[in-house]
Curated annotation (Swiss-Prot):
The gene is cdk-8. PROSITE patterns: PROTEIN_KINASE_ATP, PROTEIN_KINASE_DOM, PROTEIN_KINASE_ST. Component of the Mediator complex, a coactivator involved in regulated gene transcription of nearly all RNA polymerase II-dependent genes. Mediator functions as a bridge to convey information from gene-specific regulatory proteins to the basal RNA polymerase II transcription machinery. Mediator is recruited to promoters by direct interactions with regulatory proteins and serves as a scaffold for the assembly of a functional pre-initiation complex with RNA polymerase II and the general transcription factors. Residues 26-348 form the Protein kinase domain. It comes from Caenorhabditis elegans. The lineage of its organism: Eukaryota, Metazoa, Ecdysozoa, Nematoda, Chromadorea. It catalyses: L-seryl-[protein] + ATP = O-phospho-L-seryl-[protein] + ADP + H(+); L-threonyl-[protein] + ATP = O-phospho-L-threonyl-[protein] + ADP + H(+); [DNA-directed RNA polymerase] + ATP = phospho-[DNA-directed RNA polymerase] + ADP + H(+). This is Cyclin-dependent kinase 8.
Length: 588
């Protein structure tokens, strides 16, 4: 029997239905992000009433018409789940044109941009790393939010820095709080009717994908989220992705990725039968061994070299953060620590005051990270021209990356042989202080806003989509290739504070390319990326990134949360009183 809805009732409902355009200003707003299934805009209410408080919101438009099953799942989870470290769904709108809008909390920052800010920041003496106490508070709040999800039988399945938001200057009770966003891939995993891998074979951005997923496990648990948290933790400590590997076009129906598995075992060692008894039962285990034989890589003899990797960051293998990281990155998912167990680790108990899920991770100090509207945009034609020039440069050196992998000396072209400007050694430990204090070490005659190249999360544009879908969504802008070796990352060469960076000279040095797509026909600042946190600034570099010899670059960082300085203006640094406050309070 078919149920019919009375036409008069439908007309009355349409007349009473509130239109998003009548309630919020957002039409002229820049696109600030892209979720798993839609675009996100910054919105403010038009009317001052009690229905919507006068503050900023994130307005997410679900792509397509009507309610897809994925959108329904995301909305259902948002409406049921409430936690201080989860983004809050305020309202759902359904337009007469069958468009679905979600009204969410607005977060000014995300971990992707925070990490990128520290990776690309320059200093003549030491790299400006994320303060250790800030890392500790961020990690605790991520664990708290994920423990709540797991306690309610929900897997996030897409944890990465871009999906971890930080509230900016706003209500004092919300400032600096971590918010986990984008539940588009989340699923309830209690008593599934089918194995999770049959329903969704490809989940989690591959830099943060657990080894059991990469090897084709038919069943997976909350341990995949814990692995992703461990990857984010390592990236906060070093400002580099721990399991970076080159980007390739990955088939949407196959989670296996040989280079990613090899990178994991290169650092963690090839698991023995005692380390992971079930690894030989994984569907793609034999495929891994076959690929290794064909490549001539003795993957089964890889030792654990994680401690050597962190030695250059002065993180001792006996320290509490290292030990917690090892627990989070245990290859056997049955032995991997849970979020609740990680929250009770000695790493957090050593703090003078136990961390809380509502703490301000900025510790009430000025926020040094640029706001979304302060990030400049680049003209599409200029970005395309820069991208084409860099492609030509890359084609002139096709073998340099392979030479480096084989340990052969590289033939550097003369115009690219200049050392990176002010490159600091990555082994220098960053103080636990706020980034503002370390700005005083930079003796800038003037600070100007510069276009710098950073690293691009390879899956900012979505989850393991095919090449045709990616090309269509990115406006036919070709995706850059990554160097075949892991970080450290290079620095822009010959940067002059009066003129900005010169034309990029490409080098096949370690590190990803820093591709920043600019989609023709879209609002400036609109870049594909998951969730309201997926915003990327197209002005932060050309579409193919710089790779120069050396280590994380030093350079511009906006001060005190203010807009980037204009040409000819000097950016104020912290005063002596601020430095003393940080030394006495935040460095303890």
């Amino acid at each position: 029997m078919t149920l019919m809805i009375d036409e008069n009732f439908k007309k009355q409902l349409a007349q009473r239905r509130e239109r998003v355009e009548d309630l919020f200003y957002f039409e002229n707003s820049k696109e600030i992000g892209r979720g798993t299934y839609g675009l996100v805009y910054k919105a403010v209410p038009k009317k001052q009433n009690g229905q919507f408080p006068n503050k900023e919101y994130a307005l997410k438009m679900i792509e397509g018409q009507g309610f897809s099953m994925s959108a329904c799942r995301e909305i259902a989870l948002f409406r049921e789940l409430r936690h201080p470290n989860l983004i809050c769904l305020q309202r759902v709108f359904l337009t007469n044109e069958k468009k679905v809008w979600l009204l969410l909390d607005y977060a000014e920052h995300d971990l992707w941009h925070v990490i990128k800010h520290h990776r690309t920041a320059k200093s003549k003496k030491v790299p400006i790393m994320v303060p250790r106490n800030m890392v500790k508070n961020i990690l605790f709040q991520i664990l708290s939010g994920m423990h709540y999800l797991h306690s309610n039988w929900v897997l996030h399945r897409d944890l990465k820095p871009a999906n971890i938001l930080l509230m900016g200057d706003g209500p004092p009770d919300m400032r600096g709080r971590v918010k986990i966003a984008d539940l588009g891939f989340s699923r309830i995993y209690a008593n599934p009717l089918k194995p999770m891998a049959e329903l969704d074979p490809v989940v989690v951005t591959f830099w943060y994908r657990a080894p059991e997923l990469l090897l084709g496990a038919k069943h997976y648990t909350k341990a995949i989220d814990v692995w992703a948290i461990g990857c984010i933790f390592a990236e906060l400590l070093t400002a580099e992705p721990l399991f970076f590997c080159k980007e390739e076009d990955i088939k949407a129906q196959n989670p296996y990725h040989y280079d990613q598995v090899k990178r994991i075992f290169h650092l963690l060692g090839y698991p023995s039968d005692a380390d992971w008894p079930d690894m030989k039962k994984m569907p793609d285990h034999q495929r891994l061994l076959s690929d290794a034989r064909n490549e001539g890589t003795p993957i089964q003899t890889f030792p654990n070299s994680l401690h050597r990797y962190f030695d250059k960051w002065k993180i001792n293998s006996q320290s509490s953060p290292y030990r917690l990281l090892v627990k989070l990155l245990t290859v056997d998912p049955t032995k991997r620590v849970s979020c609740e167990e990680a929250m009770n680790d000695i790493y957090f108990r050593k703090m003078e005051r136990p961390p809380r899920e509502t703490d301000d991770v900025f510790n009430k100090y000025p926020i040094p990270y640029a706001k979304k509207e302060q990030q400049m945009t680049v003209a599409p034609d200029q970005a395309q021209q820069q991208h084409q020039q860099q492609q030509v440069q890359m084609q002139q050196q096709p073998q340099m990356g392979q030479q480096q992998m084989m340990g052969q000396p590289q033939m550097v072209q003369p115009q690219m042989g200049q050392p990176p400007m002010g490159g600091a050694h990555p082994g220098v430990v960053a103080p636990d202080g706020h980034p503002h204090q370390m700005m005083q070490q930079q003796q800038h005659p003037q600070q100007h806003h510069m276009q710098y190249q950073g690293m691009h999360d390879p899956m900012q544009g979505g989850m393991d989509e095919g090449p045709q879908a990616k090309m269509m969504r990115m406006g036919n802008v070709p995706v850059g290739r990554y160097a075949p070796m892991p970080p450290p990352y290079g620095a822009p060469q010959d940067y002059h504070p009066q003129q900005g960076p010169p034309m990029v000279q490409m080098m096949q040095q370690p590190g990803p390319s820093g591709y920043y797509p600019q989609r023709p026909g879209q609002p400036t600042g609109a870049v594909p990326g998951p969730g309201p946190q997926g915003y990327m600034n197209p002005q932060m570099g050309m579409q193919m990134g710089m790779r120069a010899p050396g280590v994380p670059p030093q350079g511009y960082m906006p001060g005190r949360g203010m807009a980037p300085p204009q040409m000819g203006q000097q950016q104020p640094g912290p005063n002596q009183q601020q430095q003393q406050q940080w030394q006495q309070q935040y460095h303890r």
